[in-house]
């Protein structure tokens, strides 16, 4: 019997396809209402933290160096009030085999795929995760397919995504490059069904749990090196897995560090817009992913996402494109380190936040990534100019995404801007209710939403009262 391969036909089979491609029956975690058993789902990986460390270390993933940025710290202190200016550190995740922290996510997923007998892995990603999956698959002797959203309707590709395709292909993956739009998820599902490969999604428990080793390492390294945990850890935020995994690892280490999410401000640019696709100079760690995925994590390519950042986030800040480009140059010229845009998003935020903190405190940027070719600032700026973006020096707060990139004319103008956390939390609650409009909200649902938002049952009740649902 021929299967219905129309868009609606494939979408009607998505849960079955996902179950076969991941080996997880997500239905067993459901309550039948709003809540589900998140911790039970995370335990579905079947691996302890120690086992995950062993898996990662066996392929050269993890144990990345911690570097103190003394010169950037000194610069921030010159701009800060007397006695302020925390010490700035980075966890150099670019030292992983594929050049980013996502090797940690991929190592677990690929190991599990091979253990279950899958012949290959597939991932839908335009970013560093594709290179990470390709790298780990090559080491494991598995086939690898990466599906990218790369081009606009005119066939013009974003330089950073094209560079990542190059890297994936260099590591042995087959890369399918698609234009912006809903076809990506459709193609992803058809490939999973046709090949029988493992879904190495960013958002499975395997992938998110893999980042727990990063958070755990951070706590152990700083206790040994400085005699205490970091005071603040800044995580570049897009889909939320980076922050979720890091925070869970810190919790397992017993750390009490403040967790700050940082994203590039792309307000006004729609990520699924063909005309706006090439108006941005950042393809990850931006608000176009960060805000939607924070306020409704289950919009991903699995039934229930393991990345649930609002459970762990204490603060959410944004920085502008010009500020990240500036700090990228500053890192290279002052510290002798040339790194890519994702980690430098968090670094721009950390540079600003450090000036609020005492000199004896520690702030850590928990990732770096490789740079080069299309990821480098020069081709990104050339591409922006070709797309009509006004590039100049001035006050970055005057920057309009899709129209201008404004470098700070003085480093004192780099300012992380806080986003209202309660607004995010209320948005998540509203989105959860919208998914289950006919459900009578139970006490367990209230407790679930309190955990989802890192608040209290009283906060959830107040938010529900605001939308006339209680």
Residue ranges and their predicted role:
Residues 108-117, 131-143, 248-254, 348-358:
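Alpha-helix C-terminal capping segments
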Residues 63, 185-193, 252-338, 380-468:
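Active-site/ligand-binding loops adjacent to catalytic centers
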Residues 1-119:
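Positively charged, low-complexity intrinsically disordered leader regions
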Residues 145-229, 265, 271-318, 324:
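Small/polar-residue-rich loop-to-helix segments that shape phosphate-bearing ligand pockets
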Residues 237-248, 252, 321-389, 436:
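Claisen-condensing/thiolase-fold acyl-transfer catalytic domains that form or cleave C-C bonds
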Residues 113-136, 140-150, 229-245, 260, ...:
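A short, small-residue-rich loop immediately preceding and capping a beta-strand
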Residues 94-103, 120-129, 202-208, 234-239, ...:
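Active-site nucleophile and cofactor-binding loops and adjacent substrate-binding regions
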């Amino acid at each position: 019997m021929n299967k219905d391969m129309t868009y609606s036909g494939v979408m009607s089979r998505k849960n079955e396809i996902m179950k076969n491609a991941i080996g997880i029956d997500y239905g067993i975690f459901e309550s039948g209402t709003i809540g589900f058993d998140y911790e039970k789902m995370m335990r579905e990986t079947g691996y302890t933290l120690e086992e995950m460390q062993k898996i990662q270390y066996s392929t050269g993933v993890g144990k990345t160096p911690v570097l103190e940025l003394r010169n950037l710290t000194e610069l921030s202190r010159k701009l800060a009030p007397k006695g302020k200016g925390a010490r700035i550190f980075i966890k150099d995740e670019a030292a992983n085999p594929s050049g980013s922290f996502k090797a940690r996510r991929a190592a677990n997923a690929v190991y599990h795929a091979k253990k279950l007998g899958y012949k290959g892995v597939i991932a839908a990603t335009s970013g560093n995760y594709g290179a990470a999956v390709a790298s780990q698959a090559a080491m494991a002797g598995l086939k690898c397919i990466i599906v990218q959203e790369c081009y606009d309707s005119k066939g013009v590709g974003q330089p950073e995504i094209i560079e990542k395709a190059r890297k994936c292909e260099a590591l042995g993956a087959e890369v399918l490059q698609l234009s912006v739009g809903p076809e990506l998820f459709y193609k992803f599902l058809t490939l999973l069904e046709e090949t029988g490969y493992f879904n190495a999604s960013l958002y499975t428990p395997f992938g998110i749990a893999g980042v727990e080793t990063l958070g755990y390492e951070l706590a152990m390294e700083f206790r040994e090196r400085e005699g205490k945990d970091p005071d603040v850890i800044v995580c570049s935020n897009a889909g939320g897995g980076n922050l979720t995994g890091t925070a869970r690892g810190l919790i397992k280490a017993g750390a009490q560090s403040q967790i700050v999410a940082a994203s590039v401000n792309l307000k006004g640019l729609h990520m699924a817009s063909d005309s706006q696709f090439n108006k941005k100079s950042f393809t990850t760690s931006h608000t176009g992913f960060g805000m939607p995925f924070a306020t409704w994590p289950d919009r991903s390519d699995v039934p229930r996402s393991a990345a649930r950042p609002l459970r762990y986030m204490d603060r959410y800040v944004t920085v502008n494109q010009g500020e990240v480009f500036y700090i990228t140059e500053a890192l290279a010229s002052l510290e002798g380190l040339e790194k890519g845009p994702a980690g430098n998003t968090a670094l721009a935020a950390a540079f600003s936040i450090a000036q609020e903190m005492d000199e004896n405190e520690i702030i850590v940027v928990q990732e770096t990534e490789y740079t080069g070719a299309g990821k480098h600032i020069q081709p990104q700026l050339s591409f922006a100019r070709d797309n009509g973006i006004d590039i100049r020096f001035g006050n970055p707060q005057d920057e309009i995404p899709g129209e201008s990139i404004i470098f700070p004319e003085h480093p004192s103008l780099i300012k992380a801007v806080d986003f209202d956390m309660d607004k995010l939390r209320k948005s998540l609650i509203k989105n959860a209710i919208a998914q289950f409009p006919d459900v009578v909200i139970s006490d367990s649902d209230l407790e679930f939403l309190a955990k989802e938002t890192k608040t209290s049952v009283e906060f959830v009740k107040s938010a529900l009262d605001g939308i006339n649902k209680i």
